């Protein structure tokens, strides 16, 4: 599999440790901050801007950041489960070893974004537009990627059981290293999609074939 070159977040060495609630109260743009070993709870902010910032060991509880703009941001060992990032614009951002169960990233724009060893069961990326995005060794069972634009987007070693790519073109994509027995796809958008031999049964089922 050819590796897609992803631009890494540009993070300064000296970040200011801060309380998230205080930071959003004082500034229109959160910039050059480190949020570590804390909980962000009950925040409902639309069109928040975050840049050159690291979230490490942060738990997000009942948060809504619709249309958030993230540029040069790292999430490391965070819990983003059920967070609402719908409509987000995300550039040069890395999400590492984080929980994203039920996270809503629908209708978002992602450019140069990497997800590494994340648990994203039931997450939604539907109606999003992705370019130069990587999912490496992520658990994405029952996730939603319907009607999504995937340009130079790779899934490497991911668990995709029950995931939905309905309405999404998988043309010339390589998902041969991923694991699934059932995948929801649009048959007219599969030309050139590279799969492993064991995936053929799943695609035969999608065609309506009965395996005996």
Curated annotation (Swiss-Prot):
Domain Pentapeptide repeat: 63-102, 103-142, 143-182
Disulfide bonds: none
Keywords: Repeat
Keyword Cell membrane included in the entry's annotation: no
Pfam family for this entry, one: Pentapeptide_4
InterPro entries linked to this entry: 5peptide_repeat (IPR001646), PA_immunity-related (IPR052949)
Repeat in keyword set: yes
Superkingdom as given in the UniProt entry: Bacteria
PANTHER family, sorted: ANTIBIOTIC RESISTANCE PROTEIN MCBG, PENTAPEPTIDE REPEAT-CONTAINING PROTEIN
Name this protein carries in UniProt: Uncharacterized protein YisX
Organism: Bacillus subtilis (strain 168)
Gene (UniProt): yisX
